[in-house]
Amino acid sequence: VHHFYHSVDRRKLIWMLAHKIKDKKYLKLTWEILQTCEQGLAIGFFICQWLANFYLESLDRYITTLDGVKYSVRYMDDIVLFGPNKKKLHRARKAIAEYLQKRLRLQMKGNWQVFPLKVRPLDYVGYRFYRDYTTMRRKNFLRFTRQCRKVRKKIERHQRIAYRTASGLLSRIGQLKHCDSVMARKKYVDPIGVRILKEVVRNESKRRQCAGKCVLAGGAA
């Protein structure tokens, strides 16, 4: 969806909420939150993530009725359709574009594509999905390997590993669990050891908790 967050019609959103939720105080508070942004939904507000998904809820139901769409996946405003017939997928794409414009007052991005998975993988949510295996997106994998080399050098030189570095690498390692990555783990993760990274994060968490208790105790005194 083109500029999704900024293009959400707030009055229509409140109208849609009012059909589901009868609590006037909640609706009023939600409207006041929406008013803090010049237009659409504010990126970063926790409630706006939920509201964005709610706004496209009817589209999800509509897609299930389209001929030729066997499966569909949506992550926020990124939508993927799967089907055996190319012409039917093109018709489904046109129907979705019309629905977005007429019912939700949104515009579909012009970079949509229709292609067979036999020819190329699906690049989606940080991964590359092939027919029978999944890999991490190339640029994400390169960042991961650089982080591993950086941490490995620090360990070999007995240097301190920063909390941000450890937590960031743990996040990348977590991504590996969702793709075919046995060789990558053996080559890059095993020489480092996840235990060392977790220990850095755990020690920093304890330090922050202790600092918070000290501030609270000082304020109470």
Named regions from a protein language model:
Residues 21, 97-106:
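A common structural junction motif
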Residues 36, 90-94, 108-221:
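Right-hand nucleic-acid polymerase module
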Residues 1-76, 80-96, 115-121:
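Conserved polymerase palm-domain catalytic core
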Residues 64-67, 104, 152, 156:
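Secondary-structure transition/hinge residues
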Residues 68-69, 105-106, 127:
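Short aromatic/hydrophobic-glycine micro-motifs
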